[in-house]
């Protein structure tokens, strides 16, 4: 008999005391193992009964865990019906895409006339000067390494109307004046009337011509250095124009603060600065990118950025409305001077401003620091400016409320059907236990269970629960067990049906009365939620039966003690049987030896 398998049921470590293989019947010819197993099988019936009971309790615990999960899911929905926002749903429809709206459960219904006076804006600090001023025209091409490392090479100027082109060699030692002169000569050679110029105030090259043309790097990176590779050819008044999209001194954010200081002949010292009173570490070896990241990751409440097209640093508050941005360089690092923001323009953020009227005559001014403005339980979301008066229609969302209540009824029926199934389902008897799935094993384990019967009956009793208020019973909402004929059967099963037309009518009359029925102090959902909570909470009714320290667990511990005792008893019995059969085998062996000796003696006597 396999006692180790039974021991594993209660997580008991079992070691046979027999040791090694037992071989019997060598002398007697008996199948000793089978005989002992048969004896143990007969004597172990009480152990089998205890084990089956233990395993059933284990399945009951699993089944109750599933029941608890189902009731938790049901309670989650029931709890939401205590909230006014669940039952009293309202919708808001705007006449403009520039203003959307959301209506809460307490929103005043009606048509809102809305004027957008001002959107909320962010405080912006913009540097008064470029970070690196444009170089004068005597700078050589090789020195213009603000964003890219200059590479001398060949640039080709195409006359797109004739297909002719002229190539210009750009050398590292060429000054900007030299390059402009070469390009002007190339225009003439390509049959184009026009001019090339460099503006020292903007750091940009401009080309004008009477013919369609293009400029392409064959080797080197002249057009990239002067930001001509991003430029578009414009046509106006019979002339074409082509201008750099950014100053040649526009910076790569990979440049260190020390490198930037070299361009501007300014000084940068490692230390600390304060933005909005928050200290930020500054190291002269910080890159522009890493410095910006430090600022943005700090608690200063601002977002810094560098726009290489404008060649300026901009700092913007993270929250809209009239927020302050303050700069302090108390350690004398020279950072703000280096970045061109020591002198700056400060554009203070504005509050959002709406004018709202319910009658189109009397207007209320409503302000908000953000573009989300609340009024009368309605939140208006501004996404742009318009001079038009916008209408927002706020009304009860009857369909949404009806669908939510139908969802509740569906969940109720699903829960009651599940409980009823667990109470009435039969165990599977046409399969061996080894062939069954866990789900099949659990079938029938809660049939007629006392606690489950109580839960089912209590929930079914809520169908006739009387709530306080203008609506007292479910049937007044059109929720009942059905018409005569089906009503009794549904009542026994705890099954509900919805008269959708009646429910819709009640909701349209006054959705707040519907919510009061569900979510009032003694409302249907309030009382139902309280009962469900008593069932599913830690150490609640279900845990007291099937929890860690519940009745089933205590029963299992008691059974495990009995099972362990029986295993020990049968183990000793098995040893005893093997010992007795071994003695028997030895006696038979001796008798056979004596018989053989007598036979040999008699045979010897007869031969004399």
Swiss-Prot record:
One matching Pfam family: FliD_N
InterPro entries per the UniProt record, alphabetical: Flagellin_hook_IN_motif, FliD, FliD_C, FliD_N
Keywords carried by this UniProt record: Bacterial flagellum, Coiled coil, Secreted
BP GO terms, sorted: bacterial-type flagellum-dependent cell motility; cell adhesion
GO CC annotations, alphabetized: bacterial-type flagellum filament cap; bacterial-type flagellum hook; extracellular region
Sections of the chain in a coiled coil: 47-75
Primary site of residence: secreted
Cellular compartment(s): Secreted; Bacterial flagellum
Keyword Glycosyltransferase: no
Reported function: Required for the morphogenesis and for the elongation of the flagellar filament by facilitating polymerization of the flagellin monomers at the tip of growing filament. Forms a capping structure, which prevents flagellin subunits (transported through the central channel of the flagellum) from leaking out without polymerization at the distal end.
Similarity-based family: Belongs to the FliD family.
Record text on subunit structure and interactions: Homopentamer.
Name this polypeptide is given: Flagellar hook-associated protein 2
Species per Swiss-Prot/TrEMBL record: Thermotoga maritima (strain ATCC 43589 / DSM 3109 / JCM 10099 / NBRC 100826 / MSB8)
Lineage, top ranks: Bacteria, Thermotogati, Thermotogota, Thermotogae, Thermotogales
């Amino acid at each position: 008999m396999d006692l180790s398998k039974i021991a594993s049921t209660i997580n008991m470590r079992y070691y046979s005391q027999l040791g090694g293989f037992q071989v019997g019947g060598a002398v007697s010819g008996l199948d000793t193992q089978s005989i002992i197993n048969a004896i143990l099988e007969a004597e172990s019936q009480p152990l089998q009964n205890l084990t089956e009971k233990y395993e059933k309790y284990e399945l009951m615990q699993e089944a109750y865990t599933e029941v608890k999960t189902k009731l938790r899911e049901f309670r989650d929905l029931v709890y939401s019906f205590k909230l006014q926002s669940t039952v009293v749903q309202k919708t808001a429809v705007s006449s403009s895409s520039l203003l959307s709206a959301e209506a809460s459960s307490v929103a005043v219904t009606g048509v809102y006339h809305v004027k957008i006076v001002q959107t909320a804006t962010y405080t912006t600090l913009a540097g008064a000067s470029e970070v690196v001023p444009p170089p004068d025209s005597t700078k050589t091409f090789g020195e213009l390494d603000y964003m890219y490392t200059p590479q001398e090479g060949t640039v080709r100027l195409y006359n797109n109307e004739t297909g002719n082109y002229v190539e210009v060699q750009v050398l590292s030692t060429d000054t900007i004046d030299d390059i402009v002169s070469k390009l002007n000569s190339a225009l003439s050679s390509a049959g184009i009337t026009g001019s090339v110029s460099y503006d020292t105030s903007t750091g940009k090259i401009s080309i004008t011509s009477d013919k369609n043309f293009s400029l392409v790097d064959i080797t080197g990176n002249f057009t990239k250095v002067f930001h001509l590779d991003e430029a578009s050819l414009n046509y106006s008044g019979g002339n074409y124009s082509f201008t750099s999209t950014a100053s040649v001194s526009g910076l790569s954010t990979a440049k260190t603060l020390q490198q930037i200081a070299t361009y501007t002949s300014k000084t940068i010292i490692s230390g600390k600065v304060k933005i909005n009173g928050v200290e930020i570490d500054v190291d002269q070896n910080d890159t522009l990118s890493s410095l910006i990241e430090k600022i943005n990751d700090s608690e200063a409440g601002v977002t810094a950025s560098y726009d290489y097209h404008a060649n300026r640093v901009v700092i913007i508050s993270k929250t809209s409305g009239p927020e302050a941005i303050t700069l302090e360089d108390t350690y004398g690092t020279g950072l703000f001077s280096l970045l061109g923001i020591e002198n700056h323009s400060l554009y203070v953020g504005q509050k959002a401003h709406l004018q709202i009227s319910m009658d189109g005559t009397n207007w209320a001014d409503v302000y908000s620091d953000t573009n989300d403005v609340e009024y009368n339980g309605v939140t208006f979301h501004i996404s742009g400016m318009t001079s038009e008066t916008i209408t927002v229609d706020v009304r009860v969302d009857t369909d949404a409320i009806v669908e939510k209540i139908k969802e509740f009824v569906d969940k109720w029926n699903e829960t009651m059907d599940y409980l009823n199934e667990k109470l009435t389902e039969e165990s599977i008897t046409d399969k061996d236990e080894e062939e069954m799935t866990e789900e099949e094993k659990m079938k029938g384990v809660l049939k007629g269970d006392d606690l489950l019967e109580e839960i089912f009956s209590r929930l079914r009793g809520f169908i006739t629960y009387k709530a306080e208020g203008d609506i007292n019973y479910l049937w007044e909402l059109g929720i009942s067990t059905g018409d005569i004929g089906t009503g009794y059967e549904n009542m026994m099963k705890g099954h509900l049906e919805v008269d959708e037309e009646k429910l819709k009518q009640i909701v349209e009359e006054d959705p707040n009365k519907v919510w009061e029925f569900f979510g009032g102090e003694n409302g249907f959902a309030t009382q139902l939620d309280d009962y469900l909570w008593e069932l599913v909470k830690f150490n609640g009714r279900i845990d007291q039966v099937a929890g860690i320290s519940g009745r089933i667990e205590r029963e299992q511990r008691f059974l495990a003690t009995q099972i362990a005792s029986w295993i020990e008893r049968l183990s000793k019995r098995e040893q005893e049987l093997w010992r007795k059969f071994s003695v028997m085998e030895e006696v038979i062996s001796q008798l056979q030896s004596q018989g053989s000796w007598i036979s040999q003696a008699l045979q010897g006597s007869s031969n004399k």
